[in-house]
Amino acid sequence: MKKGRISGKLRYKGMPVILGVFLLMAAALFAERSGIRYILHQDQAVYLDKEKVIRADEAEARLKKTCLVVMDSRDLASCQIYEQFQQILKDMKVGYEMRDMAETRELGELDAYETAVILMSDLNPLKEEVLDLAQWVKAGGSAMFAMTLQSDTYVSLMQQKLGIMSAGNDYLEVDNFHPSEEFMIGGGRDYTITDPFKSAWNITLSERAKLYAWSSGKYKIPLVWENDYGSGKFVVVNLGIYVKAVRGIFSAAYSLLSDCTIYPVINGSAFYLDDFPSPVPGGNGEYIYRDYGINVRDFYANIWWPDILALAEKYGVRYTGVVIENYGDQTDGVIEHQMETSRFQYFGNMLLRHGGEIGYHGYNHQPLALGNVKYGDILPYNTWADTEAMENAMTELLQFCREMYPEASMSVYVPPSNVLSEEGRQLLAAKCPEIRTIASNYFTGEFAYEQEFEVAEDGIVEQPRIISSAVIDDYMQLCAFSELNMHFVNTHFMHSDDLLDEDRGAALGWETLKENLDRYMGWLYTSAPLLRNLTGSELSGAIQR
């Protein structure tokens, strides 16, 4: 009996230990399923007060006009490149005056300027004014010919002054751009030009000219060079491409006009995860099953998300994820609150815990657009019944995010599919004061809300995303390289459901797409080791400044 009593006491004493083990296991399971509660890393004062922000237009109006821009509105190409230079010079904080040779035949008093940018390929409208320009450069001025020049009488008068030893009457195809390492960030390698055409003048440079960029291949085609002339210099761009995707090349070329060129840049890199957190994405999971033999839900939890976090750890990336509450297509303003929240808690809290940020994407994936927007067969979306319906949807999204992440500061809105109508934009400014940033698209596209890096009149920061997906094709690489040199910025987004869509690389498989992302991030941070990793709101704070 005595022995039995001792045994019973021992069993009783062991119960608290066993209970403690079970409680620890339960706590660990809860933490795992909820993503572990986040610790806020974000500085709550990343934004400037709206009244303290000096907008780009205001700053431009105050600039001393030190640059003369010469163009010809009768020439479509001249108009195209002038459109780009308007933004380039604004962002570089260079004050300028424009002369349109369709309206005048005189350059005016050149001594009033420090630099001149000639946006003309045909110099005949300038006539003898080109000789006055040459004399001004010889006396210490700096002039840039930004367009591929035509072989004509007045150009021939300038050839030697521009550092051209000989020139043909033909043009050569430019299928890549190779900047020297000292000329541009990310230099020392080829950047493929998609859809190349004969855009460069077939010329040979003199030994005096200093070459900064060329097209490598069978022939080394000079694309950017400078040539000293007297006390001044000429800079020539022989690229023949005048689109937004190559602004960084022109800004770098403009910087050659002075011995030291300084202008404010953003200095920031932001990676976005669109549709994240969200319900389990719909779509075709055949490539996931092909490669891993598991369903979509398990793939995202056990493979995709750990890999995304591993890349963040490797490169110091702090993702900004933007929430989709549901994938329904209802647009009548009747709201159904999301009841299944475990994925939002798990992935969202994990994202925050790793120094990331949560933003807004949509109550559903229907862009904020009314019936006056006609998608046709281009986009598979519905339009909203009225403004009240859109407002109901946004109110629900904001409330849902507050419930999911009550301690997080959320201010960034990403339009579904980068589509945002004028009415939707007005709604955000008028009814959603929480939203301080709209992050959409840098380039034009079907129904795309195209942006510049700027602060809008209503104080909302416009923050375009430059490239997307994990495919990272040649065009995206060129765009990323260009903007790294224009604004010292990177903005990239991908969707959590890219692996369910062949158009976004699903057939390549996640291993290949992951390698592409790894390679891109490696290039980015090797090329620009001083580039700051920021969240979406932090990048907006940098844009404000």
How would you describe each model-predicted region?
Residues L63-C67, S142, K198-G268:
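A glycine-centered loop/beta-turn motif at secondary-structure junctions
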Residues G20-A26, D386-E457:
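Catalytic domains of cell-wall/extracellular-matrix polysaccharide-remodeling enzymes
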Residues R74-D152, N302:
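Helical hinge/lid and interdomain linker segments adjacent to catalytic or ligand-binding clefts
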Residues K2-F22:
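N-terminal Sec-pathway targeting helices
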Residues N124-D190:
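A glycine-rich, often tryptophan-bearing local segment used as a flexible ligand/cofactor-contacting loop or short
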Residues A252-A270, D307-T320, E403-Y405, C432-F453, ...:
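C-terminal domain-boundary segment and adjacent tail
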Residues Y242-A252, L256-M350, H354:
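Active-site beta->alpha N-cap acidic-glycine motif
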Residues K65-S73, K138-A139, F145-L157, E313-E423, ...:
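Metal-dependent polysaccharide deacetylase catalytic core of the NodB/CE4 family, i.e.
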